[in-house]
UniProtKB/Swiss-Prot annotation:
Has antibacterial activity against the Gram-positive bacterium S.aureus ATCC 25923 and the Gram-negative bacterium E.coli ATCC 25726. Expressed by the skin glands. GO terms for cellular component: extracellular region. Transmembrane segments: none annotated. This is Brevinin-1PTb. Disulfide bonds join C18-C24. It comes from Pulchrana picturata. It holds the Pfam family Antimicrobial_1. Signal peptide: none annotated. It comes from the Eukaryota.
Amino acid sequence: FMGGLIKAATKALPAAFCAITKKC
């Protein structure tokens, strides 16, 4: 589940995901 959620997040909001997870 988390894997799919991460993929969706990185595709829809790459900048936000980068800032939240600190993984760029």
